[in-house]
Amino acid sequence: PRVYQIIEEINRRFIIEVQNKYPGNYEKIKKMAIIYDGQVKMAHLAIVAGFSVNGVARLHTEILKNQELKDFYEMMPEKFNNKTNGITQRRFLLHGNQNLAAWITDHIGPDWITDLSQISKLKVYVDDEKALQEFMNIKFQNKQRLAKYILEHNGVEVDPHSIFDVQVKRLHEYKRQLLNILHVIYLYNQIKLHPEMEFYPRTFIFGAKASAAYERAKKIIKLINCVADVVNNDPSIGGKIKVVFIENYRVSNAEMIFAAADVSEQISTASKEASGTGNMKFMLNGAPTLGTMDGANVEIVEEVGQENAFIFGMSADQIINYENHGGYDPDFIYNTDAEIRQVLMQLINGTFSSDTELFRDCLLYTSPSPRDGLLS
């Protein structure tokens, strides 16, 4: 086809450029070629033919420049730049959380609607008890609205006074919904073991869709629902934990979820999330971030201050070092931590499903494998 002939010509001219810049470096030519071994590398074509190449968060851009696209960045650094993803406050605050939007306008005027930097004017109310109580009343109203939706759609009664701990996003292993639900199981075990311990009630809310052919992602959704069935129907824990999986997660119910969240779970394996925008939507609606220094979380934490976020886990550099040099040993963790071992064994001992093989593949993470780069 004519289009392929054009790609061949672009490739021919580009290889000449690479040869001129790196004479005799055939390994470099092989790595950077647009067409190699019968395949057209579309990313290479886009970089060569395009005017500008950008990552979608500062960390993501640096990883592209220093790792994934290092050869191209070294040859044509002027093409590379960062454009951190963004959201519009008009959709996810003005439209999605109308009571909070009205409260903000009452306190600082309407300029924030077209210039979000104006929101910083709210800082003067940080110690104003009346303003803070009004803010929390709005949050509680939003939580009541979501609790009503959950009762109607899931048949689960949740306490709007509990902490709404929320993770809603595409289901993927690197986003670590599995880590989240394993933590829920751990807390469930602790409450069962120590019923007298102080524990403020928490409602764990998940929402996600999995790609059609992504079997493991679908298995994780199944696990979340199985855990929910057990936890929500165990009278011995006194309703201290509830688990909800919101079906058909989409923008219309997302707006309600963002407005009601107390905690925003942004726990991807550092270096794997390009940017994320849910992290922005939650923070815009007054839910602090619990997460890793990944994607746009890095810039959010810089903006709001480390003291206003709950950050854990390894850095992107540490994760990449594990990938390059090894050293992550889940077997050691499994063999030396009885509480983690109990959680993992509950996946296959009938606690959450009579089919003891159903979640066995989730245990593959306890054996060293290439997938361990996700550190789930």
Task: Report residues per predicted region.
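Segments forming glycine/polar-rich beta-alpha architectures that bind adenosine-containing cofactors
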Residues: 54-107, 175-196
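Long, charge-rich alpha-helical interaction segments
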Residues: 345-349, 359-362
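Short acidic alpha-helix that forms the nucleotide-activated donor recognition element
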Residues: 252-260
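A donor-sugar binding/catalytic signature common to diverse glycosyltransferases
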Residues: 262-307
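Gly/Pro-rich turn-and-neighbor structural signature
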Residues: 1-51, 56, 161-190, 199-203, ...
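Extended, charge-enriched "interface" segments that sit outside catalytic cores
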Residues: 96-157
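Catalytic cores of eukaryotic secretory-pathway lumenal/extracellular enzymes that build
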Residues: 244-251
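Conserved small/polar residues in nucleotide/adenosyl-binding loops
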Residues: 365-370
